[in-house]
């Protein structure tokens, strides 16, 4: 039999601090409505989603404060770098996310911006709750203990 190939996913931007600053409850994949120059700029790998978040307006989910810099070769047809971008989701998904945000006090934060195997730009969106300082310290201690435990087990045998 022929070997099945793994889907080729190209990560363009990642929010590394999100897992430290937030307790992630659920993740969901969303498409993004982009212009041509935005897609080219993301492919060049210079976009950042670290300070961004998602919010609901008029029954739709929007990505706010994501920085996709201008594409240098586009001269006057360029886009605005920090404009709000519409996230493409099904109505059931939107209702679920809006319910979590309004009732449970959760936040929608982007974890990863990537291109799927078909070349479409996707955003991995997390439903999360912000951690307090003592929660961050506790998770850091737990992570450090896991590393130390691994080192001890490797050293012994």
From Swiss-Prot:
PROSITE patterns referenced in this protein's UniProt entry, alphabetically: SSRP
Family recorded in the similarity comment: Belongs to the SmpB family.
Record GO biological process: trans-translation
Family annotation (NCBIfam families): PRK05422.1, smpB
InterPro entries for this protein: SmpB (IPR023620), SsrA-bd_prot (IPR000037), SsrA-bd_prot_CS (IPR020081)
Protein name: SsrA-binding protein
Keywords: Cytoplasm, RNA-binding
Region (Disordered) residue spans: 133-157
Molecular function, one GO term: RNA binding
Protein source organism: Bradyrhizobium sp. (strain BTAi1 / ATCC BAA-1182)
Subcellular locations according to the entry: Cytoplasm
Annotated function: Required for rescue of stalled ribosomes mediated by trans-translation. Binds to transfer-messenger RNA (tmRNA), required for stable association of tmRNA with ribosomes. tmRNA and SmpB together mimic tRNA shape, replacing the anticodon stem-loop with SmpB. tmRNA is encoded by the ssrA gene; the 2 termini fold to resemble tRNA(Ala) and it encodes a 'tag peptide', a short internal open reading frame. During trans-translation Ala-aminoacylated tmRNA acts like a tRNA, entering the A-site of stalled ribosomes, displacing the stalled mRNA.
Compositionally biased intervals (Basic and acidic residues): 135-151
Main location: cytoplasm
GO CC list: cytosol
Keyword Cytoplasm among record annotations: yes
